UniProtKB/Swiss-Prot annotation:
Belongs to the azoreductase type 1 family. Its EC number is 1.6.5.-, 1.7.1.17. One of its GO terms (molecular function) is oxidoreductase activity, acting on NAD(P)H as acceptor. Its cofactor is FMN. InterPro entries: Flavodoxin_fold, Flavoprotein-like_sf, FMN-dep_NADH:Q_OxRdtase_AzoR1, NADH:quinone_OxRdtase_FMN_depd. It is an enzyme of class 1 (oxidoreductase). This is FMN-dependent NADH:quinone oxidoreductase. HAMAP family: Azoreductase_type1. Homodimer. It comes from Psychromonas ingrahamii (strain DSM 17664 / CCUG 51855 / 37). It comes from the Bacteria. The keyword Flavoprotein applies. The lineage of its organism: Bacteria, Pseudomonadati, Pseudomonadota, Gammaproteobacteria, Alteromonadales.
Length: 206
């Protein structure tokens, strides 16, 4: 059995290509095959990291209600991440970057002493055994170009927390006509299926 943590972050609801790819993937797994934890970060947005929450993460001794709730939520999200075998992130590109909704999740799980630590040798990720797949959808073509601020950032922050086994599924040119869009979405479906099948096989053998 594989433990999935799936994150959606599109603001487009039922019209979202990235969310549909995740839905199609998860629908292939029965309760006997996978434990699935799923968050729609746009439909149920997380709190934005602000000064109060940041101070609570540094000095949790005296907290107000807002800080206490934020830390409890952060602990819960981190527990889900640590327990996962596979993290699947659906990340549509907005203005060359990830959605704000996804950034809010990152800000709550990237915590010193919880998912990374500072050592004499430099930062060290504390998460082990979690693999990640980034599913990115774009209207144009940005793969391996300077306009892609999205994938490099996600890889950096995941590596920082100790998640280094990362695959990326690209669905690009989705605004360049329906035929092109469907062709690229179908390629993304196949690639996503291959990656998850490989990871499921490795997990069952471990």
């Amino acid at each position: 059995m594989i433990n999935f943590l799936a994150l959606k972050s599109s603001i487009l609801g039922d019209y979202s290509s990235s969310s549909k790819l995740i839905d199609e993937l998860l629908a292939k797994y029965t309760p006997q095959q996978a434990i699935i934890t799923e968050h729609d970060l746009a439909e149920q947005p997380l709190p934005v990291l602000d000064g109060e929450i940041a101070m609570a993460m540094r000095s949790p001794e005296q907290l107000n209600d807002k800080q206490r709730d934020a830390l409890a939520l952060s602990d819960k999200l981190i527990s889900e991440l640590v327990a996962s075998d596979l993290l699947v992130i659906a990340a549509p590109m907005y203005n060359f970057m990830i959605p704000t909704q996804l950034k809010n999740w990152i800000d709550l799980v990237a915590r010193a002493g919880k998912t990374f630590s500072y050592t004499e040798q430099g930062p060290q990720g504390l998460i082990s055994g979690t693999r990640a797949i980034i599913v990115t959808t774009r209207g144009g073509m940005h793969k391996e170009q300077g306009t892609d601020q999205q994938v490099p950032y996600l890889k950096t922050v995941l590596n920082f927390m100790g998640i280094s086994d990362i695959e990326v599924v690209y669905a690009e040119s989705l605004a360049m006509g329906p035929e092109t869009a469907e062709l690229n979405l179908e390629q993304a479906r196949k690639q996503l299926s291959v990656f998850t099948n490989d990871i499921s096989t490795l997990n069952s053998q471990s």
